Regions:
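Non-catalytic cap/lid and distal C-terminal segments of serine-dependent acyl enzymes
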Residues: 1-193
Length: 193
């Protein structure tokens, strides 16, 4: 039996137990219009990390779902899932923070084991805004074998990451570098002109 296509997306929120954090892990998932559990090869996945003082709902509040729906339905981009983890302790220092382990060892395996997604490196992207961009760069470069693309929007970088950057880049095999996208808003209060 073929599934009936419904030309609307949906966002669902999930909670899973975590061995790395002292609380449960929460994350939202954007499912594109006409999502199907039967899609051959699965869907590409974007792990979108929110900024400090925000939640996993930040991307939806910014209108990302409507923009993605429009681009997908107009054939401008291929359908994909956007996974939006919630970093509950976003005021903690990055050093010693278990959020990256919770993402790579708990959220990603759960998504890939329960949803119809492509599990190849080039099907997996990580991006974030502000603090989320710092995590995206750290996780994407230090775990470069897992991500085909990295997006950093209004990137502040964690303090020690500037020193680690040359080592992360040197560890990446030639020709295996992830695609890298970086931008900042013209009116970002932290941008000095």
């Amino acid at each position: 039996d073929s599934e009936i296509c419904v030309n609307t997306s949906r966002v669902e929120r999930y909670q899973i137990d975590s061995n790395h954090l002292s609380t449960a892990l929460f994350f939202s998932v954007y499912f594109p219009p006409c999502y199907s559990d039967m899609q051959p090869d699965g869907y590409p996945t974007l792990y979108a990390l929110h900024g400090q003082n925000f939640t996993d709902e930040m991307w939806i509040d910014l209108g990302a779902a409507e923009k993605m729906d429009k681009l997908i339905l107009e054939g401008e981009i291929e359908p994909f899932l956007m996974v939006m983890p919630f970093e509950e302790y976003f005021f903690r220092e990055a050093e010693g923070n278990q959020f990256p382990l919770a993402l790579s060892e708990e959220i990603i395996p759960w998504v890939e084991g329960n949803l119809n997604v492509c599990t190849k490196k080039n099907c997996r992207a990580i991006a974030g805004i502000s603090r989320g961009a710092s995590w995206a760069v750290r996780i994407g470069l230090s775990e470069w074998k897992d991500f085909g693309s990295i997006g950093a929007h209004s990137l502040p970088t964690f303090r020690k990451d500037i020193d680690a950057l040359p080592d992360w880049l040197a560890a990446i095999s030639s020709g295996k570098e992830p695609r890298f996208y970086m931008d900042t808003g013209r009116f970002d209060p932290e941008v000095k002109t």
